[in-house]
């Protein structure tokens, strides 16, 4: 009985890890306030990194800074694109534009002001990093620790073949 339960749990976990879900087609806002459909800005030629973050989330900022240090190389090698989507609410939304300008990130920055994407992804915490290929979610990771960007890059290279 115990062995059957372990096998069942492993199978369930494996299916969950490898299941490909469609990227939700939600409307977000650009930093300039324009409405943007998420599916219209994902990379049609390869892999897109979608990073859900917030100005108050220290691990989010560390992750985006770490990726920024190597992003140009990643783009040259794999044609990957990154879309950083802020989940800041009305109380902290004002900080997004000035923070992005101060960080000098070379990413597409969008705002999930109504938390439509966060809800559609069932995201309970940030940072949440998702890899998308052909409008399918092919990888998800939540949280950040130094060096996690290297594991992310390995996944990007695998998907870019």
Model feature map: region roles:
Residues 131-161:
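Thiol-/selenol-based redox modules, centered on thioredoxin-like
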Residues 49-50, 82, 129:
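Hydrophobic beta-strand anchors of alpha/beta hydrolase catalytic cores
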Residues 99-132:
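Short, internal strand/loop/helix patches
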Residues 19-21, 34:
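Boundary of Sec targeting at the N-terminus
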Residues 45-48, 53-56, 125:
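Short pre-active-site segment immediately N-terminal to redox-active cysteine/selenocysteine motifs
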Residues 62-102, 114-117:
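Structural microenvironment flanking redox-active thiols in thiol-disulfide oxidoreductases
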Residues 4-15:
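Sec-dependent N-terminal signal peptides
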Residues 27-47:
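A short beta-strand-turn-helix
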């Amino acid at each position: 009985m115990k062995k059957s339960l372990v096998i069942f749990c492993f199978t369930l976990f494996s299916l969950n890890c490898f299941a490909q879900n469609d990227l939700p087609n939600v409307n977000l806002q650009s930093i300039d306030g324009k409405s943007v459909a998420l599916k219209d800005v994902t990379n049609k030629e390869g892999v897109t990194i979608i990073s859900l973050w917030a100005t108050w989330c220290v691990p989010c900022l560390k992750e985006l800074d770490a990726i920024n240090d190597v992003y140009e190389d990643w783009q040259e090698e794999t044609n990957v694109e990154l879309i950083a989507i802020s989940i800041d609410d009305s109380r902290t939304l004002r900080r997004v534009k000035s923070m992005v300008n101060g960080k000098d990130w070379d990413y597409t920055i969008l705002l999930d002001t109504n938390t439509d994407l966060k809800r559609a992804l069932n995201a309970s915490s940030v940072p949440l990093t998702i890899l998308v290929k052909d409008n399918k979610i092919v990888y998800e990771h939540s949280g950040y620790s130094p060096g996690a960007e290297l594991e992310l890059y390995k996944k990007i290279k695998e998907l870019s073949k």
